[in-house]
Amino acid sequence: MRSVEEIVELYNQRRIAAGPVHNQMRRVRELANGDVIVPLNELDKNAKASVANLLVQGLDQMSMRVSSTMPTPYFPPVKEGSERAKSSARQRRKAMLSIWDENKMQMKMRRRARHLLGYSQSAVVLKPNFRTLTPTWTVRNPLDTFAAPVDDPDNMLPDDCIFTFRASASYLIKTYGAEITDQLRMGKVNSDSRYTMLEYVDAESLQLIVLGAENNPGLNVAERAGLDALALEFVPNRTGMPLAVVANRITLDKPRGQFDGVMGMYYTRARLQALTEIAIERGIFPEEYLVARVGENPEILQLADGKNGQLGVVKGGDIQQLQLNPGYKTDTALDRLERQERLEGAIPAEFGGESGSNIRTGRRGDSVLSATVDYRVQEAQSTFEASLYEEDKIAIAIEKAYWGDVTKTFFIPSRSSVGQENYTPNKIWETDFHYVAYSAAGSDVNSLIIGLGQRLGTGLMSKESAREADPLITDPELEHDRIIAEGVESALLSSIQQQAVNPQGPYQPDDLAYLTSLVLEKDATLYDAVRRTDQRARDRQAAAMPQGAPETMPGLAMPGMGAEAPVQGPAGAPPLEALLAQLGA
């Protein structure tokens, strides 16, 4: 287990080593946030770039396409052919989906997609949440992530990782009290002073460390007193495995975001546009010079005022205007720079709701957009598949290590109802072997639905597989049961309608009226209403009524169709026992 001093030294080394990469990330962040300064003295100091920010457009569009569909965990049965193994596998899948839903994984994937494409890295740490008794995913900013170097670039599990964030002095004092003020070097402190926090994660422990203020010679003795770093929290890692997962974008040798190459072009385009605006402004408000005549001293006797019709009067000289016109190649240069940005960052015009001038048909537009976007989306989704696989294994290890024998409850998300099941982690997680896969990596939600429909039409895919792949269907098994129930209900309704139009059929007006009232007024289901109507008819037909009673009349129904109750027969001879009893009396 590393000491506080070793962790701080490790942080300083990694911060220096990651300096160039983090500087590039900060430039991407500044451009994405619009914090771009065009270095021209003629511009107002508060002026912003007045050109389209293609980086934001491309980053948002690509990230939304990557995260428009969610992957699905697949847990194969441990023993093939065993119904118990199949049931356990289904329960493991539902439990993992419930954990994802508890962590709002859909929203986290949207943020992680932006990190992966913009920063070339997506970092997440999993920790036990003792309030909800579930593993908790926390998405971390790649700018605040310092992972241990790995030999394999595809290895997403560093041996240890340091995450940083800033905390205010008021929060530290409120949370940790005298432990902070008595031991840490606080410097010139006020309630808004902020201190760097180090969150160290490895296979043995989770540690939280706060760094003291810089040892500035300008501080007095009391302000310089205290430790450089102080350990605040220590939690043993019972899982025995690293809890941080750092996914990197696939590049040649060093981290590089998808839009790193467009930044220089953007600055050039913004500067050229700014120069054009300056030239146009000077053309509207030209610079004027009072040129003296030979041997005369020029003087302006009266300033011109065009609004009031006042003429200007000049003595001893002439006023000349210096006209500046933008170059005729300026617009061509701006268009060329924009085109180069789109080519470099794979940002087609369709992202902005436009289309290239060489696109004549919708089919051609789809082909161009697919060639530009699909394979990049596929690669990003494949990266997330591998990352989520490792994250799920960590989540399973957390469940077994911290709540192995605790009976837990998970809820199966559904749009109409919520299913509830109980499980014990040590029993259900008999293995962590599984797959995480997108239904069709490289496809966004729109093209995925079209592809599923085409495969169903050609018979290449079963309806069950299509339901599992459709992102709009949260529970394929429940959807299958609903489809069967709707089909049977439709067949039952058709049967009732066909029998009702036949006057000699079993459904007579009174029975149909009773059936309709059960469905409309008492909110009974169709199958329950039919069952109750049938039982009512059976009871009526089994009860004999006296001759001439209203119940024996057919009413609106045809006679003999079962609408009337049977008539009681004539009384027969009394039984022998009754006669003997009378004689005995």
What are these model-derived regions, one by one?
Residues 16, 20, 51-59, 64, ...:
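Long, contiguous amphipathic alpha-helices that act as assembly "spine/axial" helices in icosahedral shell
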Residues 2-6, 13, 291-585:
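C-terminal anchoring/interaction modules
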Residues 1-183, 335, 528-530, 534, ...:
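Extended, helix-rich architectural segments
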Residues 2-3, 9-16, 117-121, 127-327, ...:
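Structured, contiguous alpha/beta core segments that scaffold functional sites
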Residues 33, 45, 174, 186, ...:
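Generic detector of low-complexity/intrinsically disordered segments
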Residues 35, 67-73, 138, 145, ...:
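Generic N-terminal simple sequence motifs
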Residues 1-21, 36, 40-55, 78-89, ...:
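Intrinsic-disorder-associated interaction segments
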Residues 41, 73-79, 144, 151, ...:
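Intrinsically disordered, low-complexity segments enriched in proline/serine/threonine
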